[in-house]
Amino acid sequence: MKPGHSSVPSVVNASPNMRKFWDNSALTSPADAGIRTTQVVPSTLSIGNVIISPATVLAPMAGVTDTVFRRFIRNLGGCGLIMTEFTSADGVLRKKDQKAKRYLHFYEDEHPISAQLFGSDPSVMAEAARMVEGLGFDLVDLNLGCPAKKVVKCNGGSGLLRDLPAIGKIFEAVRAAVKIPFTVKFRAGWNDEEIVCVELARMAESCGLAAVALHARTREMGYSGQARWEWIAAIKDAVKIPVIGNGDIRSPQDACAMVAQTGCDAVMIGRSAPSNPWIFRQIEQFCAGMSAAQVETGAEPSKPHMGTAAPGCPVERSSTVFDSHDPTARVGTTREGLGFSRAANASLLERALASEELDTPCHPEEPAFGDEGPMHSARTVRVSSQDNKSRLYDHPSEADRYQMIRTYFQMLIEEELPDAVGKMKQFASWFTHGVPGGAGLRKAIYESKSAPEILARVEVFFEARLAMQPVSADTH
């Protein structure tokens, strides 16, 4: 706890203190309104002594953000901070709960990384936080956003939003227990009549937390409707610690719009990442392109002509394996050889975008996502090939999707996860959204019984697609 703050601040209704502009459609529908500013996502963010660069965060998602997916996202580039699946504090302290402990497994190349915990007992939360610190995590985070009934009924996740004094006790206990930065992710309130996000953010700052993240929906909203970005702006007005915005970021334009309209210090992306794992890379490229342009004069950023080399890049770009990770160059990869092909499959991609949305809901048996929920949203931004700003970042070709699926599968196999086949089904489905004929492939994948069978179906489908030959998803 910070010196001079010996008690939890009194709880009052925060709604009267919030800026009264949510009737402004340009603010409540930012993705539909488009970008009206040149402001970009910050290049760095300091959370305590941890430097996040760029200021983008992979949200914690149950069933998704295990060590394989986190490293997969990290290798693609552009993500400044990754977070674990939300994990029961009580579970990690039980000796026999190996599943909960598996959630906290990570590798050195995942830094900086934050562990997210949920629970309602201050002493248990403090002990679990000490364990997290001892394991080498850079930050520890408290989940106050999960709307799942089984979590809420135990007074965890968003269930605690109805009891701010109890939250204050957890804040104080955890802050006193660890030296690493302590953060919190929460929703705006239980419902529209109980908006507590501003008061909660002030409480967090008073108790010495290093940053706050808001999913700009209430628990009652679940994942429906549009995220209320004005609540993020209200929190930013109320506190001096970093504020991370979360909710309805589907594109680089959305990310920049959130920063411009709320003043938030970083953006957090959850449900878009599984179906569009390159979104962090796209945001980094987009912001680099916007920053490089003469935006103060109103000049539109220019795009390197297809077939010409951007600074530091050779002209020949026929492979998906590139030489460097340079966001200003619009091409590049990481040490794992992941990246985007420059233009080889542009016509295929345009037809794919014309036929299917990239964020089509997944198979009904998709996993629970904790606070992030299933992959669907009422607000969807369609990337258009005619949009000048969308040309500032790479769009994945079918060859890219194919390579990413194979790379992710190989990582799952090497990690020997007990649910590897299930995860292969989930992510193969997500990665193929937007590909013509993908629905048939997804059905075939779901019916597959083994990893080799899934791999065979994916291989036959994509090899035929890349050869521009129609093929059935049935590979029997």
Positions of PLM-derived features:
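Intrinsic disorder/low-complexity segments
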Residues: M1-V41, C287-P396
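Alpha/beta catalytic cores of nucleotide-metabolism and tRNA/nucleoside-modifying enzymes
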Residues: K2, N17-N24, T38-T56, A62, ...
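Glycine-rich, positively charged N-terminal anion/phosphate-binding segment
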Residues: S43-S46, M61-D138
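Hydrophobic faces of well-ordered beta-strands that scaffold small-molecule active sites
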Residues: T56-A59, I82-T84, I113-L117, V140, ...
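Active-site beta-loop-alpha junctions enriched in small/polar residues
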Residues: M61, T87-A89, F118-S120, G145-P147, ...
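Non-cysteine beta-strand/loop elements that form the S-adenosyl-L-methionine
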Residues: T84, D138-P147, S206-A216, I269-A273
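Active-site glycine- and acidic-residue-rich loops that bind
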Residues: S123-V124, F186-E199
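Glycine-rich tight-turn/loop motif centered on a GG-T
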Residues: K149-A166, R217-W229
